[in-house]
């Protein structure tokens, strides 16, 4: 039996204000390790101090520590923690896994300078069991673990979890569950209905990670999981919710039958909403009050750049449909570094004219995305910490100080519309309800914006000493899913979609990836 400590790194810029989600991916990995008979603990540095981590490491002396690395901006923190941990416990086995880690595995090993023993690419639930077995028996056996990358060599290609029903999140291992929230859903738990995305947007690495596969959990296991959750708010973590109406209705009907009362927040595409309006209307009756729509751009040129094969008219029609449902809608727009002052002003005026919550992120090429291969040669920085969709890593048309001035001015639209005290008039009862229950995550958003989103602070981030830098794409690489994919594409058989939905997806994506 191995003593295994699973660790989630600290918060990023936007998680200090808008949301703080439970580490469901790490909970799944932890449960898989526990089911294999190991002694497992989980520590989330989003809500715990690093001092707590080091006290636990010294007191418990784990045999293995696994860091979750889903975001590039966390890489320096994880590397430094690994090095400091090895100094305390030279024999501890340190591994890193997660979405972003899968695309930069070799770089992580190099940055670690011997402190990192292994990087696990791909889904972690099955890989962690075999990796921990190797730690306890024969570390040379790591070379046979699918997805394992170590200094000694690489294992076979990453493999999928055979059945998503096999493992449920180890929610009991998380110490501060009331710290997790998204917007007004405070506290909020997370749940997974499906995994993967069948579309192929150029700015996204979800489809390359999963090889454009799409898999579903059974309704029975979803309901079992949901019934055990005590939090009143639920964030559905699927990349695109309710692609197929049948599954949406089946889960919803089972929820109604069990009498489960929750409030739900989900993410979907505008064309999926328009195709399956009846499903979303049904879920509104079940408690779906909040929805995120990936609009990305308000002009056809922007949509084409991000390879979203949905017309501007359809996006606006989807917004109307969501309004008709009576749900609170949040949308994201991607600010391109090429924007000038006039473009920012157009966006600001549009944001002020619509009722939706608007967030603004910065166009950022990531390893694993097609835009990484096509745009990264013009990167103006390779500092991992700036790859958080809140900093400009590509050259800007405006000077960098001017770009951040305009960006924060535009982001402040959200603050003016939804986060200032005047906006609380419509949510006064909700705010009071949170306070009575001792929940302050939602209310803290009201005054945190100015302390986090500051153009001077964002500019200063570019001048911090840089100890770890991303490798640029190899000059030999070219665009193509085979070079990008972590899990090999399995074509049509890898997608649990009915034929009509498969045809719908093909008509609404721009690529030719199988």
Regions inferred by a protein language model and the residue ranges of each:
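Glycine-rich beta-alpha loop elements in corrinoid/cobalamin-binding modules
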Residues: 2, 19, 25, 32-160, ...
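Radical SAM [4Fe-4S] cluster-binding motif and immediate context
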Residues: 21, 171-333, 337, 349
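Residue-level recognition of beta-strand->loop/alpha-helix junctions
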Residues: 8, 42-46, 208, 294, ...
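Structural recognition of alpha->loop->beta junctions
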Residues: 107-128, 280-291, 347-361
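N-terminal [4Fe-4S]-dependent radical SAM core
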Residues: 2-5, 10-13, 145, 149-193
């Amino acid at each position: 039996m191995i003593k295994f400590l699973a660790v989630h790194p600290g918060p990023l810029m936007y998680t200090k204000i808008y949301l703080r989600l439970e580490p469901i991916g790490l909970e799944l990995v932890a449960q898989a390790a526990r089911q294999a008979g190991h002694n497992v603990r989980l520590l989330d540095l989003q809500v715990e101090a690093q001092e707590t981590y080091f006290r636990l490491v010294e007191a418990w002396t784990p045999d293995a520590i696994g860091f979750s690395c889903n975001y590039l901006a966390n890489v320096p923190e994880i590397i430094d923690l690994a090095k400091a941990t090895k100094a305390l416990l030279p024999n501890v086995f340190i591994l890193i896994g997660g979405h972003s880690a899968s695309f930069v595995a070799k770089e992580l090993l190099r940055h670690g300078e011997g402190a990192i023993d292994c990087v696990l690419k791909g889904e972690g639930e099955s890989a962690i069991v075999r990796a921990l077995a190797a730690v306890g028996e024969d570390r040379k056996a790591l070379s046979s673990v699918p997805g394992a990358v170590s200094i000694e060599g690489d294992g076979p290609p990453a493999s999928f979890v055979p059945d998503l029903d096999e493992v449920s999140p180890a929610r009991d291992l998380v110490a501060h569950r009331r710290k997790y929230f998204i917007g007004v859903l405070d506290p909020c738990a997370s749940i997974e209905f499906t995994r993967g995305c069948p579309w192929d947007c150029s700015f996204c690495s979800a489809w390359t990670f999963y090889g454009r596969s799409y898999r579903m959990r059974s309704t029975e296991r979803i309901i079992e999981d949901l019934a055990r959750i005590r939090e009143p708010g639920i964030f559905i973590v699927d990349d695109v919710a309710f692609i197929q109406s049948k599954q949406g209705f089946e889960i919803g009907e089972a929820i109604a039958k069990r009498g489960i009362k929750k409030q739900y927040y989900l993410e979907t595409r505008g064309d999926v909403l328009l195709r399956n309006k009846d499903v979303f209307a049904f879920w509104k009756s079940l408690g779906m009050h909040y929805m995120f729509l990936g609009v990305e751009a308000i002009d056809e040129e922007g949509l084409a750049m991000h390879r979203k094969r949905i017309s501007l008219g359809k996006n606006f029609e989807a917004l109307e449909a969501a309004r008709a449902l009576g749900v609170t809608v949040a949308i994201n727009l991607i600010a391109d570094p090429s924007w000038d002052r006039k473009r920012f002003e157009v966006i600001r005026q549009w944001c002020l004219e619509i009722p939706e919550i608007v967030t603004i992120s910065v166009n950022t090429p990531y390893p694993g995305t097609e835009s990484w291969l096509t745009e990264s040669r013009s990167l103006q920085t390779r500092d991992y910490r700036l790859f958080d969709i809140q900093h400009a890593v590509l050259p800007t048309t405006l000077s960098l100080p001017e770009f951040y001035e305009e960006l924060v001015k535009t982001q402040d639209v959200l603050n003016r519309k939804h986060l200032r005290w005047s906006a609380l008039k419509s949510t006064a009862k909700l705010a009071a309800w949170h306070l009575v229950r001792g929940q302050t995550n939602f209310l803290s958003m009201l005054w945190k914006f100015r302390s986090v989103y500051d153009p001077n602070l964002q500019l200063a981030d570019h001048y911090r000493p840089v100890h770890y830098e991303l490798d640029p794409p190899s000059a030999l690489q070219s665009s193509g899913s085979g070079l990008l994919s972590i899990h090999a594409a399995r074509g049509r058989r890898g997608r649990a979609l009915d034929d009509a939905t498969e045809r719908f997806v093909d008509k609404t994506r721009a690529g030719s990836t199988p």
